[in-house]
């Protein structure tokens, strides 16, 4: 409904002119309106339909003239909705008469302004319009053409499919001249926007329609209004004329002037929802279908049925034979139809060439004579049998639709080709001497011939895509040229004769606004515009020639060689898009590849080869490996390798497709074998075909060209063809698999419907008042239904012979057992049995049906059979049948709307009982109950995959089964009127449908009469000749029941299958059989007929073959089968040809009661069951003496139940005699969910020996088992629950896997998973025994997961992966940030205990509590202070980019302030990022939380305020420890062999004493650190392995000055690295902005200021070993450093006094070892 409202609410594109006709709003031309982009954009959208197709194909020349005249004047209307242009409207003075306004005012009670009224006609639109705008008009043009060719063509034919007597003759002519492309502008459902002509009678309805609506919707009307209503109707006939709107396909109503005052009335359109009217068939379209003399299904077909000439029929018959009957499917399908009994299995081989003629005859009947399939199958057998049976005829009917569609599309594409040819001719003839450009390909007769030879949709698409490749760019130009020529023609012609109009109308379809080039272009267009066509042509073969080589499998066309090297030639084509010869060649190869890939012949050959050779490879996804177990439908094809698609069976590929859609499998379809080694002869398809585009010469030039050609071929295959062909093949395989499912569903319904009504025993018929008028004709059935719910009553419904419910019964305790343990239950059961007995004796049903709900149904059946037997013995009731009936249909009916309406007061289970009774009475009628507009029939379970086929296809197939069967059985119209329950069959009668069928019944009801003869269908029901011919033979009249109730002549043949067209022959046969004299005056053929019906054996003497020859001689055609059919009918009128009812067999009962099928319940299946008890074998008397004595305990053991606590042997005997010995335990009794009982023998309980099963399982326990054996008669199964059987490593029980199953890939994946599991299970730590509330034996990930729910500052202590003498303390810095601190243990008693002393770096702790209190808690407190600071920001866990963006944004907002923020760093837990932006670029430094406070720039601050106060005072100071340098700065690496033991302190002291006086305090502290002064014993330890995170520490026994591997652009350490802490000593004065770059070297002498190659700056240095003994001469280093400072100062004297530069914290600074952009001192000071 929402779609309906939205489409109705869209803005109209039309206006009304002064005659009330709809006129399209004229859009201004693109070229004229270029100054107004917004309006232009609006026009672009207005000129597209909802699919983006241009509306330039619509005939509105005359309207445009009007529009152009109107452009100058404006009627002064108010503007339309926002965003739309002001509409220029003519003023209409006579739009509504004063009488009309009076009427409106009277109804509304207010004055109405008597201005102009404008009607809106809906405009279909789509959200896609905006998107398509940017693609440019060329794309829209292509889409429009594609729409023309490939959308459904119903529109064009839809107008002719329904006769429209009210349309004036000139409209019919206009319709023929309709735009061919307009027919393809379709709505979302694929239906043409142009509504067929039957959308007409909008305002008025007959009173019959209202009455019908009232019956359907249960609404009372004021019947007094009906007279007014009739007047109104008559008036409407005068008031309105109906016209087709050519522009939008809308029907509009043109009011004519009238003086008669209309009566106010609400139409049914106002009273009911459109969807309700549609589902009840009350719309105008439905009225038109009822009125039109064509079979209803002909009118409803999406592609209408059109008459055809003999030539076309021959061509079509041949095409249908080849495609539908002679071409085998790609996959293995059981193509044998279920009607082909005893025929070969493949339908394409059984149909010989003689079938073509039969198909042609069938098509002639369908298309030219409008006969429906059942009519042809029953009354034109001579023309179609034996080759075509009824299902084959349906197939012909379906393929006729496909043929018509293909033909129309071919015609449309041909017109397009002709237009393009004409356009090309005009272009060339304008300058005939000019040579053709490289990019132009002439559209010649071979292209037209190729289109003419197209035989399938695939080929048509190939031709169309080929056309688009070469001419797609010219389509807009062609349209604009056509438009210009039309304008010119219009100026020349003033009136124009008919011939001119015809030409104009033909051109009109391509009208449209001037088109611009597409704004976005594809790669091919770019290559084309760069002029690479010329180079592409020099590859040596045209695509057509290559295609012919490929088709003929030899080099029919030699490859031509261009006399120049490809690269040399490419230089001539170098341009801005393709700047190098290599790029040019790449572009040319792309063009050649695409041309080859679009060549129809190449595609045709490859398509055929691909389908023959295609291999299927399947691998499971990660989800699939986990989810697809042996119970899954995809288990057998979880891994497939090189399975030929030709070996796929039935619906297998649909399952594969479903598994792919669910993300379980990945499918790969390829033409070559995958992963097969050792097959040297198996060359790929590419290697096979490249020789056809190859020149066999050895010169370098030829080889270079060959290389280009080979690359082009490879690209054509890999990039275009293989992908498209695989997709195409996949869709075909899916279609075949779906068709297989649809066929299986049809077959199941066929088997249900083929069952005849139940017939009681002959004896019962004779004994009973079987034809008793009071009870109704037919058999009486008692249906018994019950629910699986506990203590739910049983309901019985008695149905008479006409299907009407005459009585019912409620039995509240009938499901209880007769042998129930409780006496009360037994008594109640007995009462119900007595009640049922009395009911059976009184009502005397012929059969009792019981619902097959579950296993209880067996018990009920036995009870009822016992009751019937007892009554039979007492001679109170003849022996009647008791049948178990599948209740699936009954449950569906019980829940349907129809049953609720029919039996509103009945409880659901009673409704189910009614359906059960009716089903056995006549399955056809009962199944038809659920085949309604609600599509309830799809709720029946036909096939496990029925939900995955196209719903419409499945419904059509099921409807066909109903149509076949109903027409075979015939429909008694009078019975349908008398008993509405059987009305559902009428719609399936040949020629009728839901609309015509109900209309027929309605007429008979209105006339309050029965149908007394078939001729009344014409005389009284006004049926047209075509519909009458189709349906007459299938509507039967019970002439016997009419009897004396009518005076009219009764035609006895009306009760037979004999068609009225052959009544004369039937009479002739009767007269001839009785040897009457036809010429006698008193000859009475009707009397002869009645006599023959009584003595049909007289007909056997007739020579029907001679009669048939005589008829053929008289021009009636071949009728010999018809004559034999007439004889059969006269022998037994409307004999039921269905299979007699039979009781279900054992297997059917098992499946019915368990709701299982062989696919769901089979040997080897894994199931779950509940233990119900232990099974024992009773002891035999002779075995008593075998009691065993236990020598150790002296006690005796029972040899059966193994009880071993008897002190004396006599007690064992007493144990036997008293019956307390249960016997030997032989197994376990279980119950499955489906009601089947299971038994597990003792030896299958376990792989170990089990003597006492009760020790292994308990009653009520759930156990996993595998089925070993199924006994369907006893509803039992033998099970095993041995581990070895459940695992089934040898695949003894599991379902067999596919022949092409890839066991190797499965084993490899399995091994990989096992390795992963082992890896995960392997603990990375030693479990410890430590008593502390914060200690947990968990790993790193588990600790972090626990931390998620803990508070900030909380601690977890856990084992360390470093070994048994380490622990890790993890504490929560903030949400998602956790610091892990390494703790070293010393003085351990054993590996699992806690060490006597604990060390973090060089700091000693006595126990874990001290670490928490003195180390972690202070840091947590300091961290909390920062987290609560007003300038704290989260920045996604310390994301530098986010922080920089925040600073830049804040700086922009407040340029005069220096913004600063702090955030926790996730990469380095325990550190915080301090970001600030004094000027243009943001700067970021680190603040580290330590137990003493905050460390920032080498200083410790005990409070946050102190930290930020100092920061604000010193933010401009240079960062200590950083050498200012260019962005390419690096650090000199530390000497590999340095060790703190070898520092020359004397030299260093001398050097330090000689330092200049102006050194900063930071410099001194840095130098002091070299001598080991000022060490902070409480430095934050490197709690991870130092090499992992890139900052060192002296903990953990590691070297105190490792050079760690760091991220890219990591500066390497300088030679002046300190022994204890990993930070860098500056090598130049920090205050000086001018500096040299240090050469990264291991020697301290390399100080040349040379730019460093980037590769060296990324070198990773080896970690120095702590046992290295080579010394570093620190004194020399310090001297050298002083010398450099002196030199630097001398340079500075020549310049101005240097200003302190801002901190060199710039973005481009290389990454420090800690991972930040600036190597900061506090990073090193760990």
Swiss-Prot record:
Any one biological process term the GO annotation gives: RNA splicing
Listed GO MF terms: DNA binding; histone binding
GO cellular component: a single term: nucleus
Biased composition (Basic and acidic residues): 510-520
Sequence positions bearing Phosphothreonine: 1523, 1530, 1532, 1539, 1697, 1709, 1718
Primary location group: nucleus
Region described as Disordered: spans on this chain: 1-197, 489-520, 1636-1726
Basic residues: bias regions: 111-122
Region annotation (Interaction with PAAF1) ranges: 2-916
Coiled coil regions, renumbered to chain: 3-51
Places the protein is found: Nucleus
Physiological role: Histone H3-H4 chaperone that plays a key role in the regulation of transcription elongation and mRNA processing. Enhances the transcription elongation by RNA polymerase II (RNAPII) and is also required for the efficient activation of transcriptional elongation by the HIV-1 nuclear transcriptional activator, Tat. Besides chaperoning histones in transcription, acts to transport and splice mRNA by forming a complex with IWS1 and the C-terminal domain (CTD) of the RNAPII subunit RPB1 (POLR2A).
Protein name per UniProt: Transcription elongation factor SPT6
